[in-house]
Amino acid sequence: MDTHDNIITFNHVRFKYNSDEPLALNDVSFGIPKGKWTSIVGHNGSGKSTIAKLMVGIEKPSDGHIYFRNQCINQQNLSDLRQHIGIVFQNPENQFVGSTVAFDVAFGLENNSVSYDDMQRIVPKALEDVEMLDRADYEPQSLSGGQKQRVAIAGVLALNTDVIILDEATSMLDPAGRKELISLIHRLKEEKEVTIISITHDLTEAAEADYLVVLNDGEVYQTGKPHDVFNDGDGLTEIGLDLPFSIRMARTLLGSTDFITYEGLVKKI
């Protein structure tokens, strides 16, 4: 399978959690373009979080192969893989171990035997990248939801990973926090050239991505750019996904079924 343009590739992957259970993923094949933002979307139980676990090696395929930088992932190279892929979960509090924001970001570096002098340089830069340097001495528990997510992302950036997986990272945020995090994702992708993978059921968030992978009941339903995927609006609705607000409003106000961003909708009305 040609994986040249993808940093991660799933090739006919099947997975089940227990031998007597049905497949959680069935013959799943797709690629994650390097340096882009890919959003993996689907309703609850579609297999999104299972894919995230497979990407970071928490689980391994029952059948098929997963490639990272054209190299098939196996037990021999799994530890190396984990140095290149970081994950931020829905509730970052479950990841916090430090008494302060700075100490929490430094924790992963310490586990990787990074010297104290290097940590003194890396931690402030990572916090600056997510606009949290002024909160370095705060207790993580005192932060807002959006700020906690930024600190969790800083911890991943400090490790100089190539891929950041955001597993439902915006689902517990208010609209302002969600908007700020999405803006940060765009900036990190452009300035740091990292590959972003967001796991979500929110198509309004997914519309911000460069590329989409749509799952339905453990299988790939559709892949492509948002413009192409959302033009199949009726199909997405049939598999239990709510179309982005801008598209729903365009249908109601303009009678249009074409993909349109929120900014584009405002201009038309």
Swiss-Prot record:
Enzyme kind, highest EC tier: translocase
Matches recorded under NCBIfam families: ECF_ATPase_1 (TIGR04520), PRK13648.1 (NF010167)
UniProt-listed Enzyme Commission number(s): 7.-.-.-
This protein's record includes keyword ATP-binding: yes
Compartments where found: Cell membrane
Subunit and partners: Forms a stable energy-coupling factor (ECF) transporter complex composed of 2 membrane-embedded substrate-binding proteins (S component), 2 ATP-binding proteins (A component) and 2 transmembrane proteins (T component).
PROSITE patterns attached to this UniProt entry: ABC_TRANSPORTER_1, ABC_TRANSPORTER_2, CBIO
InterPro entries xref list: AAA+_ATPase, ABC_transporter-like_ATP-bd, ABC_transporter-like_CS, ABC_transpr_CbiO/EcfA_su, ECF_ABC_transporter_ATP-bd, EcfA_1, P-loop_NTPase
Disulfide bonds: none
Organism placement in taxonomy: Bacteria, Bacillati, Bacillota, Bacilli, Bacillales
Name of this chain's protein: Energy-coupling factor transporter ATP-binding protein EcfA1
